[in-house]
Amino acid sequence: MNKKIILSISLVGFLSLANAQTEKQIPEVTIASKSLQEINKSGKNVTLLTQKDLEKYKGQTLSDVLERITNFQITGSFNNNSEPKTLRVRGGDNNVVILIDGIPMKDVTTIKNNVMDIRLLSLENIESIEILNGASSVLYGSNAGTAVIDIKTKKNSYKKIDAAFGMRGGSYGTFAQNADISGKLGIFNYHISGFNEKSDGLSSAEGDDSFDKDGFEKQALNAKAGISLKNFNFNLNGGWNHHLFKYDNGAFSDGENRGNDKQAYLGGNANFLYRNGQLTLNTRFSNNKRIGETFIGNSYQEQYSYEGKDFFAELFNRYDFNKNIQLTAGLQYENQKMNENENSSFDAFANALFTYRFVHLEAGTRLTNHSKFGNQWTYSANPYLYQELGSSFIKLGYSFATAFISPTLYQSFGSLPYVLPNPDLKPETSLSHEINISFGKKDRSLLISAAVFNRKEQDVFGYYTDPFTYLGIYKNISENTTKGFEVDFNYQLTSKIGFGGNFSFVEKENHAAMKRQPKQRVNSYIEILPFKGSRVLISHLFVGGRADAYYDSLTYSTREVILSDFNLFNASISQQINPKLSFYLNLNNILNKEYTDVVGYTTKNRNFTFGMNYRF
């Protein structure tokens, strides 16, 4: 019976959260070409979550939202909130680029891929999310092997002063508060936001009642200010994020450990519009500090400490030769430091878009000169057909692209005495083919899309341990081929009923590289607006079986396991009392399903969040 119910819900459309909208204005995105473009006309299928979409997920985490995106697997998403979250997109392993307001945000203290820790980001400060699947190194450089995620922070108000406040509480002794104030004074605009969250949590490691809870707390403060003129705008932005959390020794192993992560950043953005194009300057400096401590005797004592700094600067120009030819070209510089180690890179890139009636061709190339491994070329070609049929559209495209992943400072320089340096470590490279098709309404009230892809990876990073000295080192040890397909469906049946979802499939020739990655995933949802100001959202998630492994401290060996598939049902209810006040209730894992996300670590049982928002 349960299988019939699950199948019925899944067949309501191969279901996806992505982009259910009823606005008549066609939304525009910047992620596909680095400049504003109607989302339907981009060469690849782009996922857009507007503020209206994110309203459905109040009180949840960013990983909760990304879990609903096609072919996204956020490992650790269903464990204790303080546990690490790994983004696995289309079978990749954290090889994504995260942008904040169009500018890369990186953490150079990480072991691999320098991906920002998404635990530091609160949904309360996010206006919208744009996602571009597939290799995108031509526009975004290293790490853009499987996806680019652009997180747009809250917009400034057009009033002189506007303020909002929110608070929530729920299971595991979790309480959070957020506030923001923004406004516009003539040509000047500003926005300040703050966030605080504390939780008793649950035991990170799976075990008996003697395992203590691993709580956490997070604080964030963000600010931006700028000026807006007719043909020029400039803004400064900065922020501080803090995450203090307890964690256990490992799978099935309790412990008294504490992590203390801090991130600070300062950046700027300037845009100059002229008759035939736009000139853009992006800069950002970020500093990350990570401290790990273990409780020994009667106090916490430091076990490790890393500090990393990243400086990024980019200047690019979009020029429209005419309505049929557009060229975007630019320069990029990045410098990374961690403790005493450092590397830098200088990039030049160009990307052109040619249009003739319904035929389009996007092609580009990038040259990266890296202080560690020299020159690296990447290139892409994306021919596609786009035709509007009244209020509808249809698009069919093919893309061919290369991408690369630079070794991190940790992988290149090691961490003595445990990890040896490898000065000969080369970048990991990939070659991707993709065919995509989409059909729907231009206002996105109906959207059907599908994609099939094949990605060949070479010089994949691997960690090798010497069996005699037990010292480790990172090497280029393997190659692999990943293939899969994905389907999205979203339909706004009436002004009060919408449904949709997604199905994704991915597999690798080297099955050992599929650790913690399912072959199949299904998301589905139905949204109902029963009364004025009311919203009811019911969602379903299916995650297929996965291979996993853990270190057994009793046998001093690694044990491999196969994790069972699982289904989760969630519900969200919200009520707008008046234009200023609203309430919401989230119910997760309604059926109280027992399941495993990561072997040896506790997953969340039935839980809830209740909250309110007030706008002054």
Where do the model's predicted regions map?
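Surface-exposed extracellular loop regions of Gram-negative outer-membrane beta-barrel proteins
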Residues: 289, 371-377, 383-434, 452-477, ...
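Short acidic/polar hinge/loop motifs at secondary-structure boundaries
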Residues: 86, 104-133
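Flexible loop and strand-edge segments within Gram-negative outer membrane beta-barrel domains
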Residues: 199-206, 211-220, 231-310
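Outer-membrane beta-barrel signature, preferentially recognizing the C-terminal barrel domain
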Residues: 253-269, 273, 399-457, 465-492, ...
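A beta-strand signature from Gram-negative outer-membrane beta-barrel systems
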Residues: 120-164
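Extracytoplasmic beta-strand/coil segments of soluble accessory domains associated
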Residues: 38, 63, 67-104
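Short strand-turn segments of transmembrane beta-barrel domains in outer membranes
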Residues: 153-183, 194, 209-214
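Gram-negative outer-membrane beta-barrel transporters
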Residues: 323, 355, 454-456, 475-551, ...
